[in-house]
A protein has these predicted regions:
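Hydrophobic transmembrane alpha-helices and immediately adjacent juxtamembrane helices
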Residues: 1-171
């Protein structure tokens, strides 16, 4: 329980770290935060073209695009959070050696910035559902419990891999 108390006591540092991660991800980029929309959108377009047309396989039909978007956006959240979070302890080694704070803040901030990115990307799902006439159903309320479970799973994996990454270089 002391970990939760420490995180609560250092919540401002956590919030600042999340903001820094989000700004740093798009700093120097011409499109900035628009990449939160474009990255999953471009992935969807590639999968939409590659699988049914080039390979002649995959799920087809009128909801194929929605099918792709609802799978790629959560996967992108998971993949990005694990990739960034795994190397986060080693990347912030200098500050860890100089200042005391709960070390869990560093990987946690990576996952939280991934959640913010995910929620921004969810606007794409909403736009496509409304734009294609599929509409939104009552299943939308399941997004938040699923997001909590996926975030906790991602956080657990990130904690384990970031600890291993300090000692093993190739993770």
């Amino acid at each position: 329980m002391s970990i939760f108390k420490n995180l609560y006591n250092y919540r401002e540092l956590l919030k600042t770290n999340v903001k820094k991660d989000i700004r740093g991800r798009y700093k120097g980029s011409f499109l900035g935060i628009l990449w939160s929309f474009l990255n999953p959108l471009l992935q969807v377009v590639v999968y939409w073209i590659v699988f049914p047309y080039l390979f002649g396989r995959g799920v087809t039909g009128e909801n194929y695009l929605i099918y792709l978007i609802t799978g790629i956006i959560p996967w992108t959240f998971f993949m990005t959070s694990v990739n960034m979070g795994t190397s986060s302890i080693k990347a912030n080694g200098g500050i860890i050696k100089k200042v005391y704070f709960p070390r869990e803040i560093i990987p946690l901030s990576q996952v939280l910035s991934g959640i913010v990115n995910f929620l921004i990307s969810c606007l794409i799902i909403i736009i496509f559902c409304i734009g294609t006439g599929t509409g939104l159903s009552y299943h939308v309320i399941a997004v938040f419990p699923i997001l909590i479970v996926q975030s906790l799973l991602t956080l657990g994996i990130v904690f384990i891999l970031s600890a291993i990454d300090v000692y093993v270089q190739d993770i």
